[in-house]
């Protein structure tokens, strides 16, 4: 430090210098040390995930999300909160979800569950809005009677399965089709006590945690003086692998959602036209190791852990989609083939990843205890999916429901290995099935994680540019 600089940093200048040093310290810790290295509870390093996602997964999953089979999602945003009296929905205009009018939805999508791979439709590759949806292809009427009977069996099986999340009844009058591309996940202004109540309920009541242990930075917890959260992590490390994994999945999902909000933040609005983009200040508020007392980097590591879990699920479910009987049907033969080819290409990439999480390490104890723990795990997660109906912002609720359903589908896949291995090639299996709703949620949820990791790289670059 030069003599001139020493003289300058007095009084208010000293405060400014300290702030500058804090910023540089954040950059250094984030880029070089805090979010690097090997993840806990697995043998994968963050740098390998970054490269794999950037060069193999992200470009393809982004294209897949733009395919019409994966862009339409039927969801009930009017289900009442089952846990407390919700004090109304968010009135902020950016919270609003614009559904596709029923009359605009292609016939192929409205066909319902009688043909589970024919519930999306498109014949145009560039669809600007729902107004053009009626141009899409209709259902292929050349299905054999045998296939139609098989589809009925599939629907029966779907209704009887034990899911890891609460599924919306697509036949409910309150369920609506939403074009995900027209309703992107981004910062809406939804915050405060309502948002905190949702996440507090998730963490405090559904993460195998006693009430006497408080997670760090919980604004609803009683004051703990100088406690920086180490007591929480001491407790967490003392848990079995399965319960640690559960917490990391929820924390990773929370981190991913926060990254989306920071990356697509309402920066300004002029002449009624909003401008969205990355907000570095908001990113620092949520992830800066200084501002979050070390929590930010832990959250980001949990994001990578969640990415590994869903990546593993995609690699395990590949045989299900590789069968000739599975066709992501839209009514346009050429487009159908392209969509499936792209999906299978993504599956091939997921199988090539060399450092997968080993799900066999979970629920590996005595059979009775493992079965009981697995059921508790499933019910806790299913409860979290129900909490998403308590989110006051419609757009936040939409993406919260989709991403919890996607993770729930991933967990269902990971714990159905034997059923997937025994799938028949040319006929439906009663041992394992996925609904179209689950397929759309699974791939879009993983796409959100892939985007989160890509956005994290963008924030690192922005911060480095500011040095």
From Swiss-Prot:
Key words, A-Z: Disulfide bond, Electron transport, Endoplasmic reticulum, FAD, Flavoprotein, Glycoprotein, Membrane, Oxidoreductase, Redox-active center, Signal, Transport
Cofactor: FAD
EC number annotated for this UniProt entry: 1.8.4.-
GO cellular component, one term: endoplasmic reticulum lumen
Family as reported in the entry's similarity comment: Belongs to the EROs family.
Assembly and oligomerization: Homodimer; disulfide-linked. Heterodimer with ERO1A; disulfide-linked. Also detected as monomer. Homodimers may be somewhat less active than monomers. The abundance of monomers and homodimers may be tissue-specific. Interacts with P4HB. Interacts with ERP44.
Function field: Oxidoreductase involved in disulfide bond formation in the endoplasmic reticulum. Efficiently reoxidizes P4HB/PDI, the enzyme catalyzing protein disulfide formation, in order to allow P4HB to sustain additional rounds of disulfide formation. Other protein disulfide isomerase family members can also be reoxidized, but at lower rates compared to P4HB, including PDIA2, PDIA3, PDIA4, PDIA6 and NXNDC12. Following P4HB reoxidation, passes its electrons to molecular oxygen via FAD, leading to the production of reactive oxygen species (ROS) in the cell.
Name of this chain's protein: ERO1-like protein beta
Organism: Mus musculus (Mouse)
Gene coding for it: Ero1b
């Amino acid at each position: 430090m030069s003599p001139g600089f020493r003289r300058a940093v007095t009084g208010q200048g000293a405060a400014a210098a300290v702030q500058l040093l804090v910023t540089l310290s954040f950059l250094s810790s984030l880029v070089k040390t805090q979010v690097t290295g090997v993840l806990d509870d697995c043998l994968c390093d963050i740098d390998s995930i970054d490269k794999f996602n950037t060069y193999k997964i992200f470009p393809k999953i982004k294209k897949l999300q733009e395919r019409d089979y994966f862009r339409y999602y039927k969801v009930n945003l009017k289900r009442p909160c089952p846990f407390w009296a919700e004090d109304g929905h968010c009135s902020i205009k950016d919270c609003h979800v614009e559904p596709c009018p029923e009359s605009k939805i292609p016939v192929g999508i409205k066909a319902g569950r009688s043909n589970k791979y024919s519930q999306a439709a498109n014949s145009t590759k560039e669809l600007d809005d729902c107004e053009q949806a009626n141009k899409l292809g209709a259902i292929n009427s050349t299905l054999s009677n045998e296939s139609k009977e098989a589809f009925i069996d599939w629907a029966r099986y779907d209704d009887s399965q034990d899911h890891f999340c609460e599924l919306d009844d697509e036949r409910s009058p309150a369920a609506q089709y939403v074009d995900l591309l027209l309703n992107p996940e981004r910062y809406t202004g939804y915050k405060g006590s309502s948002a905190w109540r949702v996440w507090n309920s998730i963490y405090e009541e559904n993460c195998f945690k006693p009430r006497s242990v408080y997670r760090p930075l919980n604004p609803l917890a009683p004051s703990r003086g100088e406690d920086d959260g180490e007591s929480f992590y001491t407790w967490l490390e003392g848990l079995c692998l399965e319960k640690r994994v559960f917490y990391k999945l929820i924390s990773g999902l929370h981190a991913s959602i926060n990254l989306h909000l920071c990356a697509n933040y309402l920066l300004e609005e002029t002449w009624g036209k909003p401008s969205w983009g990355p907000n570095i200040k908001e990113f620092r508020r949520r992830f800066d190791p200084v501002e979050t007392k070390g929590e930010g980097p832990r959250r980001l590591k949990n994001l990578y852990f969640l990415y590994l879990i869903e990546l593993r699920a995609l690699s395990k479910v590949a045989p299900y989609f590789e069968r000739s009987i599975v066709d992501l049907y839209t009514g346009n033969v050429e487009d159908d083939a392209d969509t499936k080819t792209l999906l299978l290409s993504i599956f091939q990439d997921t199988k090539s990843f060399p450092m997968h999480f080993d799900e066999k390490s979970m629920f590996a104890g005595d059979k009775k205890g493992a079965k009981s723990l697995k059921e508790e795990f499933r019910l806790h997660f299913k409860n979290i999916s129900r909490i998403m109906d308590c989110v006051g912002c419609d757009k936040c609720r939409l993406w919260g429901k989709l991403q919890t359903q996607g993770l729930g589908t991933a967990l269902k896949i990971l714990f159905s290995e034997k059923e997937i291995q025994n799938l028949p090639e040319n006929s439906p299996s009663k041992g394992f099935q996925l609904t179209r709703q689950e397929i759309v949620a699974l791939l879009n949820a993983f796409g959100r994680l892939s985007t989160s990791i890509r956005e994290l790289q963008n924030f690192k670059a922005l911060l480095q540019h500011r040095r």
